[in-house]
């Protein structure tokens, strides 16, 4: 599968504030030596580092002051750590307005999260599981158990019109009536970062709406489902996401994810042998994502699934039928060509055709070429996107793709090649999946690895 879904990223696991019932955290399988708590006589609060994953079972140390730097329009994060030798029944925290003379960055522009712990592991059968802080939780209060550490996360959104200078404020944490405070300083320079919708960086983190429905136990595509997805997808838009992930067949990756991707387009074979297609779910999903601010590209997976199995509803028998066929076979053509023609007409009617890509990933080149030939037969103006575990130059098909994403290991592409593609309006990116071990965006990955991936793409000249 091409890319780690967005749910693995701490930034995007900040769940809807509407959900105030949280699953209990698991016990720490590796708590470490508890003697480290013997010298801790009372609760303490300090500024930590956003680059450190603090153990829940060990006391944390940090600084009493913090100075952050930001452009106008930038988002910056901070992490504080609360360690306590005794049970704290009720912990809450607030951040004041940040003031620079008469200029103010209001507290409403600072999102606050308790950081919850999740179980992770390095590799199946290669190491034991361990606990890491990863889930940014919007809950307003929390019980903190004795001899534990609880990180607190701040997401500061600097206005684009903020006056340059040093802003100062205070973080206040209330623990059973006792207040702990830390000063916070933010240095804002004169440079301005554009709105995320204007960023050129082509970020494509796959979305899985089915995971959200399962997590919150709500019906697929219900109002409750969209209500839970909205704050998550707006966070994704704020990160600069450009692409909407759509599954146009059932289980395009052979159900390899915990929450399988279902088809957003229903395909129905009529009694007379003709075809009808229901785009209701597809249309609602795409429009919803556009309303959240993600509207540059629509990637539709896939015409070359990992299991080569396609399904449709057969009106003659009132049952769902499955067909196993590959792009070179006649059955594939009979099934896919009518759909592609109808899909193109639908996309054009919606005004979405020129931003839509038929997307394929990591399949044998002969199968990709056969599918691509059929796509062009259906409509020569279709665009194709591919996640390719091939080196550039292995095939001429790559040169035809509107958007190619190359496996991280093969991401040393001649800059002049990417410049030539860019001049034609084409995109060239690289991707991570279950590889490499690092840098990546697993729950166990160091936080700096995600930042490095962006800098690495820029340095190599990718889009």
Q: Locations of the language-model features?
A:
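Mature N-terminal, pre-catalytic/accessory segment of carbohydrate-active enzymes
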Residues: 17-254, 353
